[in-house]
From Swiss-Prot:
Disulfide bonds: 94-104, 117-137
Name used for this protein in its record: Cystatin-like 1
Listed PANTHER family: CYSTATIN-LIKE 1
Coiled coil (residue ranges): none
InterPro entries associated with the record: CSTL1, Cystatin_dom, Cystatin_sf
The keyword Transcription is assigned to this record: no
Organism in which the protein naturally occurs: Mus musculus (Mouse)
Length: 140
């Protein structure tokens, strides 16, 4: 019987270490929760630029969209920074297949379309790394 108990020591120790490590990781990842903080202009601009580029790449629309307004911005520190943003975006007059123009005016005719999007973006700003984790848009 003692031999069986010795044989279980290492697996049980490994299980204990795994549980402790996972508890620490989960604690770190949820450190503080989302907060409405004044985000640096540079970080929010690069995050919104990443968002709209991702949205345009995934969209089946012929026209490009641009961010019209940041409605709400929250951030949470994890292993990087998670941004929970709500933005209003609008369809522009620039087509996707055209050479990118410095300025794309918004549609003003029957093609006018605005969306409210709520997105979760993971970022490691000091490494210029962004990933769109979740996005949901509805017509406004």
């Amino acid at each position: 019987m003692e031999m069986k108990a010795r044989g279980l020591r290492i697996p049980l120790l490994l299980l204990l270490v795994t549980v402790v490590v996972m508890a620490k990781v989960n604690h770190i990842q949820r450190w503080g929760g989302f907060k409405e903080k004044a985000m640096s202009k540079k970080n929010i601009n690069s995050t919104l630029h990443f968002f709209i580029r991702s949205y345009n790449n995934a969209s089946n629309d012929t026209y490009l969209y641009q961010v019209q307004k940041l409605i709400q911005g929250q951030m949470q520190l994890t292993t990087g920074v998670e941004y929970l943003v709500t933005v209003k975006i609008g369809r522009t007059k620039c087509k996707k297949n055209e050479t990118k123009k410095a300025s794309c005016p918004l549609q003003s005719s029957k093609l006018k379309k605005s969306l409210i999007c709520k997105s979760l973006i993971y970022s490691v700003p000091w490494m210029n790394y962004y990933q769109l984790w979740n996005n949901s848009c509805q017509e406004s």
